[in-house]
Amino acid sequence: MGSTLATHFVKLGAKVILCDRDQQGLVDTYWRCHALSDQVAYFHLKDFSPESIETLLDMVEQKFERAPDVLINNLPSAPLPSLVDEKPSEQFIQQLAAIASSLFNFSHACSRMRQRQTKGVIVNVVCYNTVQDRSGIVSANSMVSGFTQSWAQELTPFNIRVGGVVPQIASANDEIVHWSEMREELIRNTEYIVSNEYFSGRVMSA
């Protein structure tokens, strides 16, 4: 999903900066985008800690002489343990903490940089890649919805908008057909939020 989002915005003429912990996937996406435009760069992150993200944004600002106008947080959902599992608590806490920390650390660092400039937008996008990953979608959607609304209230005085895009839950019967359509809708909704200067504090469903 992240690769598809990146190539979509490259086709629209945007200058795109890619970052991820998955180095091979990151490089593959870079070359896919680079075949369409030379206005693309990538940075490999060892983790999503505040220090790593601050270093990344410092390098971006040095290379491009400005902070990013748009931050798209792409969050793949993962299956969460059930309440009836034998020992679900540690896995559940780790997975939710990973989602929350990456969301918060990126958004916090970018919003601080944007406050020194004119305006910006943060879009939190939830997706899933397999049928098994759907079990975590409700929790991920709820988390993104809450963060999006509260952060929009905090950042409105700084002219920074925050929006969210989340998938609806599909039945197993139409999973194959639905995912292709839903991915296109997620991308369209993300583009809409980026381009609509009056959209903030809300979440769109695909």
Question: PLM features: residue spans?
Answer:
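Glycine-rich NAD(P)-binding loop of the Rossmann-fold in SDR/ketoreductase-type enzymes
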Residues: 48, 94-102, 181
